[in-house]
């Protein structure tokens, strides 16, 4: 009885016939879980690998609830609590195995203090005896570290962090791009419109995920020496937020080391000509308040001397957590002339927090000059919010298109962004996205606009004959020019306007080059 008390103290055990869930709609990756459970994978376990609020626990519940009554009797859901260790968990599992349990769903496995050291017990002992084991945990990086070490070649990973727009739309039954952005690209119960919600997610799901995983690693210094240094000086979140605030497609140490200037604040000031907000906003106060809200430190306030090693290590872990995407970029695809790779933050909530922080601070009267009226305040706040959503819409469309066509044919399709200065006339031209079918020698040019209005200026680059000739010569003959925006689909002077939500939903089912018609 003493041993039983020990393991029940640190884990919660729920038998399969006690599991029920009201969630009917399923993640697209659910069939991968079903496939693992219904087929033989000798000596292997399955891991639901992803950030918080991406449906891992719900998927476990859904699978268990659909089992027959007979199979439910052979199934158990175990929730690991803090201070649980592998000895306690193994004792509980052996007892259950002796009673006929063969399906083990182990949630919050990264709470097990020595999981990264003894996690191969699941594969080498229980799975080898014919048990089916599915694990999941909040600190998903800990699972990745185990996969690269003690569970190498013994684990099937099901990735849950990335929730494309179409899947999000299906799960919550809403086609709004705004909802997707405001909910942070996760399956949370409430939108990330409050700074507290977005900050809590960043602290726990991202920063905490990295640090807790490294703390439980036998070789934390080998895996994350630079990250650990930033954490010890309480500067990791600051560096992460300064990377995000650049709102650019390439982050450097020099850029992160610059004094913080809120991108939504300064970009909105410079993009609104009338009225001139230079004389209406207490800019320095608003910037400082936003900086404080995001926990950002400037170079002279940091104890750590930020280096390329720090930045590269942080980027690497963000890649492992599926929060970061690197997209190859070319100045000329035909000649092979490269430009810097694009770097995109995949989790909208991380970026939308910057808009949330600014807007919250702009609610304070002290941020405005006495000459600024309520209407002007509201206009500025709306435009600042639209600025961030515009950046996010570009990121979402570019990332989802890239991932889709990489999956269809890695070698045939090229998807990236293009921004160049034409050498013959010194014109600066750009496309928010270019899609090239290398097999056919065809190019598609896209502008992405967070707007429901058709404005002629939106297509100035798409109508630039010098730019089109450059694309023909360096990427492939321009087949079609498109604007992706939030309005209704239509056609204006050979330029197609497609609704962004409609386009993103088509991406989920496309199996070849998308045909605008």
Region locations from a protein language model:
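Conserved P-loop NTPase "ATPase switch" module shared by AAA+ and STAND
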Residues: 97-119
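Accessory nucleic acid-recognition modules appended to NTPase machines
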Residues: 218-431
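N-terminal pre-Walker A segment at the start of P-loop NTPase domains
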Residues: 1-37
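Sensor-1/coupling segment of RecA-like P-loop NTPase cores
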Residues: 125-147
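Interdomain motor-coupling "hinge/lid" segment immediately C-terminal to the ATP-binding subdomain
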Residues: 146-284
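Conserved lysine of the Walker
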Residues: 56-57
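Conserved catalytic cores of phosphodiester-cleaving nucleases, focusing on short active-site segments
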Residues: 397, 401, 431-457
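Domain-level recognition of nuclease-like catalytic cores that cleave nucleotide substrates
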Residues: 482-517
């Amino acid at each position: 009885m003493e041993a039983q008390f020990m393991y029940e103290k640190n884990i919660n055990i729920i038998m399969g016939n006690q599991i029920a869930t009201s969630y009917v709609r399923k993640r697209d990756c659910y069939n991968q879980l079903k496939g693992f459970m219904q087929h033989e994978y000798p000596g292997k376990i399955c891991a639901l690998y992803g950030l918080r609020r991406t449906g891992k626990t719900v998927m476990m519940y859904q699978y268990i609830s659909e089992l027959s009554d007979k199979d439910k009797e052979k199934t158990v859901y175990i929730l690991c609590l803090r201070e649980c260790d592998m000895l306690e968990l193994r004792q509980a599992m052996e007892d259950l195995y002796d009673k006929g349990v063969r399906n083990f769903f182990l949630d919050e496995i990264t709470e097990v203090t020595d999981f990264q050291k003894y996690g191969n017990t699941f594969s080498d002992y229980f799975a080898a005896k014919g048990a089916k084991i599915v694990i999941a945990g909040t600190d998903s990086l800990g699972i990745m570290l185990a996969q690269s070490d003690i569970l190498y070649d013994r684990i099937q990973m099901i990735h849950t962090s990335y929730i494309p727009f179409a899947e999000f739309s299906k799960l919550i039954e809403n086609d709004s791009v705004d909802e997707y952005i405001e909910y942070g690209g996760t399956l949370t119960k409430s939108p990330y419109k409050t700074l507290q919600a977005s900050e809590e997610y960043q602290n726990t799901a991202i920063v905490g995920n990295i640090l807790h995983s490294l703390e439980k690693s036998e070789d934390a210094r080998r895996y994350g020496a630079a990250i650990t240094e930033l954490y010890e000086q309480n500067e990791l979140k600051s560096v992460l937020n300064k990377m995000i605030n650049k709102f650019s497609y390439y982050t450097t140490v020099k850029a992160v080391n610059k004094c913080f200037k809120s991108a939504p604040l300064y970009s909105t000031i410079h993009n609104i000509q009338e009225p001139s907000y230079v004389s209406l906003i207490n800019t320095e106060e608003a910037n400082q308040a936003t900086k404080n809200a995001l926990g950002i430190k400037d170079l002279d306030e940091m104890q750590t001397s930020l280096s390329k090693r720090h930045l590269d290590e942080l980027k690497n872990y963000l890649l492992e957590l599926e929060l970061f995407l690197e997209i190859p970029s070319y100045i000329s695809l035909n000649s092979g002339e490269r430009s810097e790779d694009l770097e995109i933050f995949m989790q909208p909530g991380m970026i939308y927090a910057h808009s949330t922080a600014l807007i919250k601070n702009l609610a304070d009267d002290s941020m405005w000059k006495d000459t600024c009226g309520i209407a002007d305040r509201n206009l500025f706040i709306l435009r600042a919010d639209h600025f961030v959503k515009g950046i996010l819409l570009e990121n979402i469309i570019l990332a989802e298109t890239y991932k889709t066509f990489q999956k269809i044919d890695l070698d045939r399709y090229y998807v990236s962004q293009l921004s160049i200065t034409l050498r013959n006339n010194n014109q600066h031209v750009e496309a928010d996205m270019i899609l090239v079918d290398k097999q056919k020698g065809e190019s598609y040019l896209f502008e992405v606009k967070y707007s429901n209005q058709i404005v002629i200026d939106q297509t100035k680059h798409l109508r630039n004959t010098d730019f089109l000739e450059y694309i023909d010569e360096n990427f492939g003959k321009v087949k079609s020019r498109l604007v992706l925006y939030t309005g209704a689909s239509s056609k204006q002077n050979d330029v197609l306007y497609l609704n962004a939500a409609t386009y993103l939903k088509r991406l989920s089912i496309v199996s070849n080059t998308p045909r605008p018609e």
